[in-house]
Design a protein with these regions (language model features):
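N-terminal Rossmann NAD(P)H-binding glycine-rich loop of SDR-like oxidoreductase domains
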Residues: 4-24
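Conserved N-terminal Rossmann-fold NAD(P) cofactor-binding segment
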Residues: 40-72
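ADP-ribose/adenylate-binding Rossmann-like module
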Residues: 89, 100-118
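Rossmann-fold NAD(P)-binding glycine/threonine-rich loop
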Residues: 112-134
Length: 394
């Protein structure tokens, strides 16, 4: 008998606080016990007080756990049915938590965007997680819920037995450049700098190749990584080597709905030639600067871990994913929209995923699996009903 239904590890970090508040707000309707966990008892008590004051009758429990003290992580995992971790970077702090969940048969969720971490966890723990009947589900935030479920929604509107191709074009809107930069938390900024090196980008490409080698009997391919121009919207597409691609490909490998063959492309959508050229220049400068150790050290200083955008800035941020799906006999265009991608929407996606695993009759699939493979239509419904996401066929 587990003591808690859902435990949130890293609850006093920036995204952790937002997720804790969202979960506390949902307890009255969903009826689950909640614990918040971390290493700083004082901060946990402060958050507990604020949440219980705001949501009357919402009892919040506290667990002390530290990634540097593995017995405390094991104890935390053994005490709960579903464990959410917002403690990153996950390459540094994630494996201890995953391992504890695998051993104890505890379902695990995170919001990592670190492709190499996801790959390592699948290679190391998929078999043992399947044996212990643990669902290890990475990328349950903006990376990669919109891409994974947007693609899933798109292919559901195409004939099942035909070859399928999906292109995803993403855009994020903010009030202005200052607001856009302020919208990045310290943790996200540090993770991005860790990713932005040429070796990591090359490793990401190698990872896609490994996934493609697993694609029999279903053939899975990545669409050519070249710039796109969309005449209808006068917008340019820049190929993005991000974890979303890996997640979508893994979903396609495991589910029959994706058809006998499936191809996917993932692009950043930029409106107009001036912004397109400016974005290319900005990205090139950022990538170049991040290769020079002294400059990279200075870039790290621009954001502190724990920093993040205020509610006013978050309320101005929106995301939009446009999916173009094609099969032999049909073409469909899908729009997926939501609020502040980095934090507001992410906390809702993560929270709803945890509640979905706990309360919904989801498929009995275990191991290191994707959000779509784990939760499918059940989470798709929750995202639209509770997380302010809209999925539309245009």
């Amino acid at each position: 008998m587990r003591e808690y239904d859902i435990t949130l590890f890293g609850a006093t970090g920036f995204t952790g606080i937002l997720t804790a508040e969202y979960l506390a707000s949902r307890r009255a309707k969903e009826d689950f016990s909640l614990a918040i966990a971390g290493r700083n008892k004082g901060r946990l008590l402060g958050l507990k007080y604020e949440l219980e004051k705001k949501y009357i009758g919402s009892e919040i429990n506290i667990l002390l756990a530290d990634v540097d003290e593995e017995p405390s992580i094991r104890k935390m995992a053994e005490a709960t049915k579903v464990l959410i971790s917002t403690v990153g970077p996950y390459l540094l702090y994630g494996e201890t938590v995953v391992r504890a969940c695998v051993v104890s048969g505890t379902h695990y969720l995170d919001l990592t965007g670190e492709g190499s971490f996801v790959e390592q966890m699948e290679l190391k723990y998929h078999k043992s997680a399947n044996e212990s009947e643990a669902k290890i589900i990475n990328c349950c935030g903006y990376d990669s819920i919109p891409a994974d479920f947007g693609t899933y929604f798109t292919i559901k509107n195409l004939p099942t037995t035909e070859l399928k191709e999906v292109e995803c074009f993403i855009s994020v809107t903010s009030k202005d450049f200052t607001s856009a930069f302020s919208s990045i938390s310290g943790g996200t900024w540090h993770s991005a700098l860790g990713f932005m090196n040429l070796q990591e980008i090359e490793r990401q490409r190698d990872m896609y190749a490994k996934i493609l080698l697993r694609s029999r009997p279903r053939e899975i391919t990545v669409l050519p990584t070249e710039f796109r121009f969309r005449e209808a919207s006068k917008s340019f597409g820049i190929p993005l080597p991000v974890v979303d691609i890996e997640v979508v490909l893994r979903s396609a490998l495991q589910l029959e709905e994706y058809g006998p063959a499936f191809s996917y492309g993932h692009f950043l959508s930029i409106q107009g030639l001036p912004k397109f050229l400016g974005s290319l220049l900005g990205f090139s400068l950022f990538l170049g600067a991040s290769q020079i150790p002294p400059i990279k050290d200075l870039l790290y200083l621009l954001k502190k871990n724990g920093d993040g955008p205020n509610e006013e800035i978050r309320s101005t941020n929106k995301f939009h994913h446009s999916f173009i799906g094609k099969s032999g006999s049909k073409t469909v265009q899908v729009s997926v929209t939501g609020g502040d991608p980095g934090y507001g929407a992410t906390s809702k996606m993560l929270g709803e995923a945890a509640i979905c695993i706990l309360n919904d009759p989801i498929p009995e699939r275990y191991g290191v699996i994707t959000p779509v493979v784990a939760m499918g239509d059940f989470l798709l419904e929750r995202l639209q009903k509770n997380a302010d996401m809209k999925f539309k066929v245009l």
